[in-house]
Amino acid sequence: MIGLDTNVLVRYVTQDEPMQSAKASRLIESLTAASPGFVSLVTVVELVWVLQSCYASAKSDVVMVLETLLHTRELTVEHADIIWQALRKFVANTADFADCLIERCAHAAGCEYTATFDLNAVKATGMKRIG
């Protein structure tokens, strides 16, 4: 298994930098189900942030990228089940993906609730506002 950093996935997805994109493509396309790439939870969060913030990717495009990652047999995605849950929340409302993931991770850990000051996160994800 080979760990994949956010920048490798960004280059593969965007194909915007010829040399790095080609190297990322060769690496990712060489992966197999027996020797997969590993995508950490942090990498997923960074990938979403980079695509939305730096590339102005539409929410629908980000969702498609995440669904593709999660369906790819040649990738092992850390906590894929929790990411799927967060993705469903992300699709269904206006919350940031990170907020959806934070709430779902806390839920999976057995937390009674997730505390926040963010009103949008309260409305969209079911977090509890404090203060």
Question: At which residue positions do the language-model features occur?
Answer:
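Residues that scaffold the ATP/ADP-binding catalytic core of kinase and kinase-like folds
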Residues: R11-V13, V50, A124-T125
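Acidic, PIN/NYN-like endoribonuclease modules and their adjacent C-terminal/linker elements
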Residues: M1, E103-G131
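Short, well-structured N-terminal submotif of metal-dependent ribonuclease cores
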Residues: M1-V39, C54-S60, E67, G131
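Acidic catalytic patch
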Residues: D16, L41, M64-A92
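Short beta-strand scaffold positions
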Residues: L4, F38-V39, V77, F97, ...
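Alpha-helix capping/helix-boundary segments
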Residues: V8, T43, I82, L101-I102, ...
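Short active-site oxyanion
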Residues: A34-G37, E74, G110-Y113
